[in-house]
């Protein structure tokens, strides 16, 4: 069975795409359909909500970071034995980076590649008939990206709905949803985006409220009729990040949460065993594992507890003496000597690398990254080219004396310089690895 699919797009972030996407996913799941979510680009938070809403794994589909073969393989995997795939756009529908055609990282790339229709979510607060001009611009901007319908979001009244909706339908686009303003439907955010799905005490209740909204305010049958088959060309996993070991000790708790779903899924698919442990519960990596991986997350919110986790710290030092450890972003921060939290208090970290970081001295670092490894590490062999994404506010306050791990370029190929560190069996970077670049 091959799924039918539709892209949920918008002019910008904050238009309501995520709430509409989750509402549709949860509502269709409650109807007994097999539905999966996907997210364009490198945002690793939204797939967690997609998974919670459906009970089936979400995935990122990133046309810049993933070579076409891997992109097709992951898209086909989402479509297999599934009724519908709802693909949520990052940012605005056409937003990406200047790159080769089809490799910009935008959701529009996926619409062209797979011939998928777009359901356009318009935040019409502060406007009415002007929304039709916006919709017409989207409908005519790129003839290879087809707008199939519109959802009006944040309406103030029935009159507001009629003015906006009639103008849009007059240009030939069906309006399949009209959502009144309701701040209680908003998902809470913090500095790296939405608060993660696993942090909600009443997550399912909120997802069901979004599903109730979708049932009430959207014509879900019409949305399903707009979807078209998702049938990617043949793909493969040669460019996936290979398992760094047969048994992988993976830090997994409220401080360590940012691991791309497709990365862990492929490790398992390739035969590796993932053995989770919780640094916040003062657990050490299992000594029987071959490698330890500290993913990103929010260690700055738990720095005091991590600093006091003596079993964790001793176990990591013991592991590092003979086996590889790699940290990404938040994990990289914990591998260093010290971490200053937002209040200015400094906490001792693992000291397996010599750098120190601060969350009190904040500056956003954001963008695609391409890294050529200077040495063998859990990311790959020396000389390997890895594509990923960097998004953090922490700043380096001390660099230490460790060797650089990689030479970094931004998404446009502009050199950024040496990045990350390595010492003995330990390595770390601020960027999150997504895939290997094609040879």
Curated annotation (Swiss-Prot):
Molecular-function GO term, any one: ATP binding
Database matches in PROSITE patterns: GATASE_COBBQ
GO terms for biological process, alphabetical: cobalamin biosynthetic process
InterPro entries linked to this entry: CbiA/CobB_synth (IPR004484), Class_I_gatase-like (IPR029062), CobQ/CobB/MinD/ParA_Nub-bd_dom (IPR002586), GATase_3 (IPR011698), P-loop_NTPase (IPR027417)
EC number(s) on file: 6.3.5.9
Domain GATase cobBQ-type: 247-439
SUPFAM superfamilies registered for this protein in UniProt: Class I glutamine amidotransferase-like (SSF52317), P-loop containing nucleoside triphosphate hydrolases (SSF52540)
Site (Increases nucleophilicity of active site Cys): 432
Pathway where this protein functions: Cofactor biosynthesis; adenosylcobalamin biosynthesis; cob(II)yrinate a,c-diamide from precorrin-2 (aerobic route): step 9/10
Cofactors that this protein relies on: Mg(2+)
Catalytic activity field: hydrogenobyrinate + 2 L-glutamine + 2 ATP + 2 H2O = hydrogenobyrinate a,c-diamide + 2 L-glutamate + 2 ADP + 2 phosphate + 2 H(+)
Family, similarity comment: Belongs to the CobB/CbiA family.
Domain remark from Swiss-Prot or TrEMBL: Comprises of two domains. The C-terminal domain contains the binding site for glutamine and catalyzes the hydrolysis of this substrate to glutamate and ammonia. The N-terminal domain is anticipated to bind ATP and hydrogenobyrinate and catalyzes the ultimate synthesis of the diamide product. The ammonia produced via the glutaminase domain is probably translocated to the adjacent domain via a molecular tunnel, where it reacts with an activated intermediate.
Note: The a and c carboxylates of hydrogenobyrinate are activated for nucleophilic attack via formation of a phosphorylated intermediate by ATP. CobB catalyzes first the amidation of the c-carboxylate, and then that of the a-carboxylate.
PANTHER family, alphabetized: COBYRINATE A,C-DIAMIDE SYNTHASE (PTHR43873:SF1)
Function noted in UniProt: Catalyzes the ATP-dependent amidation of the two carboxylate groups at positions a and c of hydrogenobyrinate, using either L-glutamine or ammonia as the nitrogen source.
Protein name: Hydrogenobyrinate a,c-diamide synthase
Native source organism of the sequence: Mesorhizobium japonicum (strain LMG 29417 / CECT 9101 / MAFF 303099) (Mesorhizobium loti (strain MAFF 303099))
Gene: cobB
């Amino acid at each position: 069975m091959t799924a039918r699919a539709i892209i949920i797009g918008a002019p910008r972030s904050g238009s309501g795409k995520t709430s509409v996407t989750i509402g549709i996913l949860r509502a269709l799941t409650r109807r007994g359909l097999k539905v999966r979510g996907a997210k364009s680009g490198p945002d690793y938070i939204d797939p967690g909500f997609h998974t919670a809403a459906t009970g089936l794994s979400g995935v990122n589909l990133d046309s810049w970071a993933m070579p076409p073969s891997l992109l097709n393989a992951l898209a086909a995997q989402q479509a297999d034995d599934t009724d519908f795939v709802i693909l949520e756009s990052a940012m605005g529908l056409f937003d990406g980076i200047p790159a080769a055609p089809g490799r910009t990282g935008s959701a529009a790339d996926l619409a062209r590649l797979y011939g998928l229709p777009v359901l356009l979510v318009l935040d019409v607060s502060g406007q009415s008939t002007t929304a039709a001009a916006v919709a017409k611009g989207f409908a005519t901007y790129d003839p290879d990206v087809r707008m199939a319908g519109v959802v009006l979001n944040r309406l103030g009244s029935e009159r507001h709905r009629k003015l906006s909706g009639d103008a849009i339908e007059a240009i030939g686009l069906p309006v399949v949803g009209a959502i009144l303003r309701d701040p209680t439907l908003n998902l809470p955010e913090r500095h790296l985006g939405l608060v993660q799905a696993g942090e909600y005490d009443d997550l399912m209740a909120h997802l069901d409220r979004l599903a109730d909204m979708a049932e009430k305010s959207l014509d879900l049958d019409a949305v399903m009729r707009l979807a078209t088959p998702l049938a990617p060309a043949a793909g493969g996993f040669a460019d996936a990040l290979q398992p760094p070991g047969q048994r992988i000790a993976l830090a997994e708790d409220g401080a360590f949460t940012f691991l791309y779903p497709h990365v862990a899924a492929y490790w398992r698919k390739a035969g590796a065993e993932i053995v989770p442990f919780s640094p916040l519960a003062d657990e050490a990596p299992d000594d029987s594992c071959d490698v330890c991986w500290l993913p990103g997350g929010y260690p700055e919110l738990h720095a005091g507890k991590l600093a006091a986790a003596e079993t964790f710290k001793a176990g990591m030092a013991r592991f590092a003496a003979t086996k590889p450890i790699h940290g990404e972003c938040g994990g990289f921060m914990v591998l260093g000597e010290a971490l200053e939290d937002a209040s200015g208090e400094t906490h001792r970290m693992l000291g397996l690398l010599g750098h120190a970081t601060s969350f009190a001295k904040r500056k956003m670092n954001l963008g695609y990254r391409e890294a050529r490894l200077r040495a063998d590490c859990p990311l790959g062999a020396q000389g390997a080219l890895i594509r990923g994404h960097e998004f953090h506010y922490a700043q380096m306050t001390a660099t230490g004396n460790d060797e650089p791990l990689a030479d970094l370029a931004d998404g446009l190929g502009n050199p950024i310089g040496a990045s990350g560190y390595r010492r003995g069996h330990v390595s770390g970077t601020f960027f999150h690895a997504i895939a290997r670049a094609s040879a």
